[in-house]
Amino acid sequence: MHKSVLLKEVTDFLSNPCPKIHIDATLGLGGHAKALLEVCKDTFLIGIDKDENAIEIAKEKLKGFNAVFYHGSFKDFDIVLKEEGLLYFDSILFDFGVSSLQLDEEEGFSFQREDFLDMRMDKRQQKTAYIVINTYKEKELADIFYKYGEERLSKKIARSIVEKRKKKPIETTKELVDIVSSCYPYKYSKINPATKVFQALRIEVNSELEDIKIALSKLLDFAKEGSKFAFISFHSLEDRLVKEFIKNNADKLKVCSKKPITPSDEELLYNKRARSAKLRCAKLCYNEKKDEAFDS
């Protein structure tokens, strides 16, 4: 069962005061959206997600609320706003994590299942993890694993993949896990050796970091005085982009806390997938002092 990460913290921040127009740019199964709409009855929600299955589930969950739904990337939030005849939003949420639905279904996101190497969040796109693993050159694979997964054995793993696929295509997550694991000289106790490679593949297949950059580059163009921004990231590459955005706009943004908000010990007891989550939030304030964090 999917549990929305940092649910209380996000809801408390976004609902004080309640937004008239809220964009959940990564709607998922609608957990964050429902929590906000239960508090803010008059809020108009625009929900966007790449995963069509997730949208259908969210629609059911959010029946009776004032909401519209779009199948697409969070980077296109501005196009969606224009389709609704709107010029700006009052608040926006980005949750950059993979949903439990995607991890639990046969989508190739999880190395704990034996699935076909897919990893597409949006099934309309052509590129899959299978295509990346079986057609990219050795150097391209090594660069992806190092850049997006911060994998120190990137070259060795890429070399091994290329050797293996000469005999037969690498088709399943288990095959890939076995190849990556064989490159490690000893067994890792804390994380599966394939964790970083799977992260890198997911980012490459779905253009995740590029989409984040695009979204951040136009965010302020569709915000107004007092508009709120909430970002949930799950690894340093995502968080770094958000930090840079906030830093580069320090003269316009007021952060809700100096450091990112992380899950409480209580949340981690029932939601282990939240352990790496970080929430950064800010509001657009042209006319306020920015030297102190505000209380959400």
UniProtKB/Swiss-Prot annotation:
Transmembrane segments: none annotated. The gene is rsmH. PANTHER family: 12S RRNA N4-METHYLCYTIDINE METHYLTRANSFERASE, S-ADENOSYL-METHYLTRANSFERASE MRAW. Belongs to the methyltransferase superfamily. RsmH family. It comes from Hydrogenobaculum sp. (strain Y04AAS1). It catalyses: cytidine(1402) in 16S rRNA + S-adenosyl-L-methionine = N(4)-methylcytidine(1402) in 16S rRNA + S-adenosyl-L-homocysteine + H(+). Keywords: Cytoplasm, Methyltransferase, rRNA processing, S-adenosyl-L-methionine, Transferase. Specifically methylates the N4 position of cytidine in position 1402 (C1402) of 16S rRNA. It comes from the Bacteria. It is found in: Cytoplasm. Gene3D superfamilies: Putative methyltransferase TM0872, insert domain, Vaccinia Virus protein VP39. Its EC number is 2.1.1.199. GO terms for molecular function: rRNA (cytosine-N4-)-methyltransferase activity. This is Ribosomal RNA small subunit methyltransferase H. One of its GO terms (cellular component) is cytoplasm. S-adenosyl-L-methionine binds at G30, G31, H32, D49, F77, D95, Q102. GO terms for biological process: rRNA base methylation. Its main location: cytoplasm.
